[in-house]
Amino acid sequence: MGQKVNPVGLRLGINRTWDSRWFADGEQYGKLLHQDLAVRAMLKKRLYQAGVSRIIIERPHKKCRVTIYAARPGVIIGKKGADIDKLRKDLSVMTEGEVHLNIVEIRKPETDAQLVAESIAQQLERRIAFRRAMKRSIQSAVRLGAKGIRINVSGRLGGAEIARMEWYREGRVPLHTLRADIDYGFAEAKTTYGIIGVKTWIFKGEVLEHDPMALDKRLATESGPAGEGGGRERGDRPDRGDRGRRDRG
């Protein structure tokens, strides 16, 4: 089961917490949920070049606090903060209220699963060989401290007539171990042959105590604020290096 389920959802309440942190009654819940979806979609599209990894939305007392984790915060802030001011105004219109905007820099984007997946997708769109892109990302992640990484790509790889899936893994990626701190990311590469899906799992270590805020604490130690607006499991198999497996589909 751990091989199939989303590793973030599986660990919610254990060593991960929700990215939307607010409470609403039945009448307001649907409205606020759709606002969250619209805000996330707009930010991901508008700030794609900034390398956005996570978007945290909190709603304390009729206000909205949005925290953006990005690899290139300067792209968001803009010259003399002009871009972030415009972004805050646009978010205020979408949420129909006051918005506090915080930007947090990700100092090691090579070990962030979402950013790794998006980087590989961008390389595939530039016609770089998928094996080269995968191996390069794996080497960078391991060099910068990741204890394990696995990357899946699926689709018409290399323009093949029949779609297939290939994966590479380095180190341990224990998907069944609930105390494991596993970062997960997904991206799509829109190529001339069709869409190629990219999935990334990065193992950061184990969280021994029950702490749903463990990820936030780790990111706080690794990152810095860039700007502010107001027996053995299947996943524990010995390292097989860069061996990949193909599945025809």
Swiss-Prot record:
CDD domains, per database record: KH-II_30S_S3
Annotated keywords: Ribonucleoprotein, Ribosomal protein, RNA-binding, rRNA-binding
InterPro entries: KH_dom, KH_dom-like_a/b, KH_dom_type_2, KH_sf_prok-type, Ribosomal_S3_C_sf, Ribosomal_uS3_bac-typ, Ribosomal_uS3_C, Ribosomal_uS3_CS
GO molecular function terms attached to this record: mRNA binding; rRNA binding; structural constituent of ribosome
Protein's GO biological process: translation
HAMAP family per record: Ribosomal_uS3_B
PANTHER family reported in the protein's UniProt record: 30S/40S RIBOSOMAL PROTEIN S3, SMALL RIBOSOMAL SUBUNIT PROTEIN US3C
UniProt function note: Binds the lower part of the 30S subunit head. Binds mRNA in the 70S ribosome, positioning it for translation.
Similarity comment: Belongs to the universal ribosomal protein uS3 family.
The protein's name in its UniProt record: Small ribosomal subunit protein uS3
